A protein has these predicted regions:
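Active-site rim helix/loop that mediates acceptor-substrate recognition in acyltransferases
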Residues: 1-16
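Conserved acetyl-CoA binding element of GNAT-fold acetyltransferases
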Residues: 41-57, 109
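Conserved beta-strand in the GNAT
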Residues: 18, 24-33, 49, 54
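Conserved catalytic-core motifs of GNAT/GCN5-like acyltransferases
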Residues: 33-38, 85-87, 93, 97, ...
Length: 118
Protein backbone atom coordinates (compact mmCIF):
# COMPACT_ATOMS: atom_id res chain seq x y z
CA UNK A 1 0.00 0.00 0.00
CA UNK A 2 2.84 2.43 0.71
CA UNK A 3 3.90 2.21 -2.96
CA UNK A 4 0.45 3.53 -3.94
CA UNK A 5 0.72 6.52 -1.62
CA UNK A 6 4.35 7.21 -2.55
CA UNK A 7 3.34 7.32 -6.22
CA UNK A 8 0.43 9.60 -5.34
CA UNK A 9 2.70 12.01 -3.51
CA UNK A 10 5.20 11.98 -6.39
CA UNK A 11 2.58 12.70 -9.07
CA UNK A 12 0.54 15.11 -6.91
CA UNK A 13 -2.55 12.90 -6.76
CA UNK A 14 -2.42 12.34 -2.98
CA UNK A 15 -2.54 14.88 -0.17
CA UNK A 16 -1.79 13.78 3.40
CA UNK A 17 -2.32 15.82 6.55
CA UNK A 18 -0.98 14.88 9.96
CA UNK A 19 -1.91 16.46 13.29
CA UNK A 20 0.70 16.47 16.05
CA UNK A 21 0.57 17.42 19.70
CA UNK A 22 3.86 17.77 21.58
CA UNK A 23 5.66 15.85 18.82
CA UNK A 24 3.23 12.92 18.83
CA UNK A 25 0.91 12.15 15.92
CA UNK A 26 -2.68 12.41 17.15
CA UNK A 27 -4.59 12.34 13.86
CA UNK A 28 -4.34 12.16 10.11
CA UNK A 29 -6.33 12.12 6.90
CA UNK A 30 -5.80 11.90 3.18
CA UNK A 31 -7.21 13.01 -0.15
CA UNK A 32 -6.81 10.98 -3.35
CA UNK A 33 -7.35 12.87 -6.61
CA UNK A 34 -8.52 11.31 -9.86
CA UNK A 35 -9.59 12.58 -13.26
CA UNK A 36 -12.97 11.32 -14.48
CA UNK A 37 -14.63 11.54 -17.89
CA UNK A 38 -16.51 14.74 -18.55
CA UNK A 39 -19.86 15.55 -20.09
CA UNK A 40 -21.29 18.25 -22.34
CA UNK A 41 -19.86 20.95 -20.08
CA UNK A 42 -16.25 19.77 -19.74
CA UNK A 43 -13.88 17.19 -21.17
CA UNK A 44 -13.05 15.86 -17.71
CA UNK A 45 -13.55 16.50 -14.03
CA UNK A 46 -11.20 16.24 -11.08
CA UNK A 47 -12.78 14.26 -8.24
CA UNK A 48 -11.44 13.20 -4.88
CA UNK A 49 -11.81 10.62 -2.16
CA UNK A 50 -11.26 11.44 1.50
CA UNK A 51 -9.69 8.46 3.22
CA UNK A 52 -7.80 7.23 6.25
CA UNK A 53 -9.32 9.79 8.63
CA UNK A 54 -8.21 8.79 12.10
CA UNK A 55 -7.71 10.36 15.51
CA UNK A 56 -6.05 8.48 18.37
CA UNK A 57 -8.59 7.63 21.09
CA UNK A 58 -7.06 9.96 23.73
CA UNK A 59 -7.33 12.94 21.34
CA UNK A 60 -10.91 12.39 20.19
CA UNK A 61 -13.70 14.92 20.73
CA UNK A 62 -11.28 17.85 20.49
CA UNK A 63 -12.02 18.89 16.90
CA UNK A 64 -8.88 17.39 15.36
CA UNK A 65 -10.73 15.42 12.67
CA UNK A 66 -12.86 18.46 11.86
CA UNK A 67 -9.75 20.59 11.35
CA UNK A 68 -8.08 17.95 9.16
CA UNK A 69 -11.26 17.39 7.15
CA UNK A 70 -11.82 21.11 6.57
CA UNK A 71 -8.21 21.53 5.45
CA UNK A 72 -8.59 18.62 3.01
CA UNK A 73 -11.81 20.15 1.65
CA UNK A 74 -10.12 23.53 1.23
CA UNK A 75 -7.18 21.90 -0.55
CA UNK A 76 -9.62 20.10 -2.86
CA UNK A 77 -11.34 23.40 -3.68
CA UNK A 78 -7.98 25.04 -4.38
CA UNK A 79 -7.07 22.21 -6.76
CA UNK A 80 -10.38 22.51 -8.64
CA UNK A 81 -11.97 19.29 -7.43
CA UNK A 82 -15.63 19.11 -8.47
CA UNK A 83 -16.81 16.39 -6.07
CA UNK A 84 -15.55 14.58 -2.96
CA UNK A 85 -16.59 11.13 -1.80
CA UNK A 86 -15.75 8.91 1.16
CA UNK A 87 -16.64 5.73 2.96
CA UNK A 88 -17.50 6.06 6.63
CA UNK A 89 -18.34 4.13 9.74
CA UNK A 90 -21.41 4.99 11.80
CA UNK A 91 -19.08 6.82 14.22
CA UNK A 92 -17.87 9.15 11.48
CA UNK A 93 -21.25 10.00 9.92
CA UNK A 94 -21.95 13.00 12.14
CA UNK A 95 -18.58 14.58 11.35
CA UNK A 96 -19.04 14.24 7.59
CA UNK A 97 -22.64 15.46 7.65
CA UNK A 98 -21.57 18.48 9.72
CA UNK A 99 -19.39 19.75 6.86
CA UNK A 100 -21.95 19.05 4.12
CA UNK A 101 -21.48 15.44 2.99
CA UNK A 102 -24.72 13.65 2.04
CA UNK A 103 -25.66 10.17 0.95
CA UNK A 104 -25.63 9.98 -2.87
CA UNK A 105 -28.96 10.37 -4.65
CA UNK A 106 -28.39 7.18 -6.57
CA UNK A 107 -27.43 3.86 -5.00
CA UNK A 108 -23.78 2.92 -5.25
CA UNK A 109 -23.05 -0.61 -6.41
CA UNK A 110 -19.83 -2.50 -6.78
CA UNK A 111 -18.71 -5.84 -8.14
CA UNK A 112 -15.56 -7.29 -6.61
CA UNK A 113 -13.54 -9.10 -9.23
CA UNK A 114 -10.63 -9.90 -6.94
CA UNK A 115 -11.48 -12.01 -3.89
CA UNK A 116 -8.46 -10.56 -2.03
CA UNK A 117 -10.07 -7.12 -1.83
CA UNK A 118 -11.99 -6.37 1.34
Amino acid sequence: MSIFFNKGITNNSFVALIAEHEGIIVGYGGLILRETPGDFNRDSYLEGDILNMYTVPKARRKGISTIILNQLINEAKTLGVSKLALHTSKDGEQLYRSVGFNKPLYPYFELKLDDKIL
